[in-house]
Amino acid sequence: DGMVVNNKTSERVHNNRGGVVEFLLANHPLDCPICDQAGECHLQDLGYEHGSAKTRYEEERRTFDPIDIGNKIKLHMNRCILCYRCVFVANQLTENRVHGVLHRGEHAEISTFIEQAVDNDFSGNMIDVCPVGALTDRTFRFKSRVWFLKPMEAERSCNKCCGKAVVWMFGNEIYRVTARKDKYGEVEDIDGKTAWLCNDCRFEHKSATDWNIAGPRVINRHSVISQGKYATSMEKPVKRIG
């Protein structure tokens, strides 16, 4: 009805967002130089756009030791912003969720119940939906920065999932496999269904011969990944092969 919402140009909105980001960063460590999520971290982007050069927070930050919550997933609770996305996704994908939010208030943390291991066939999707580096892929840990890799659309025949993924390559070697995401960072819908990946496709098939590679993934030209002389951007659609 003629309503105009200025969500980017309004100084008031920008200042309010800065306040929210400051709260999110209150307990967040400066791990960007060593975090595998650097370069594709939503909080890193928000901090760069709205954050202050220094914090006003003087109290001691919460600290946790990194733990393995499965044989493929590392949890860095120091980086967690308690968005609960991993919990919601686990509820969708399994009836036997073994992790969640423990305690309340400032003592709340993500962990497994009675230190059980997360081992369902789709647990790797929790890594994809984590907006920060709280959940990371142990098979990719510290191997490369994302801006050194080339994301390629690929697929394979799989009886557990859709088999459609993004393989991150350096030369002819696949360093990691992730679900396909849209421009908002959400896992894409393919054929009317969310394109979750099974753990077999994600962790066990990292040879180029395991996949039918269609071509470069379309990315935003402002992404740090595009700085690695990556030609395909959102403004220049990719020409499919086959």
Where are these predicted regions, by residue range?
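N-terminal export/assembly segments and adjacent metallocofactor-ligating motifs
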Residues: 2-28, 34-242
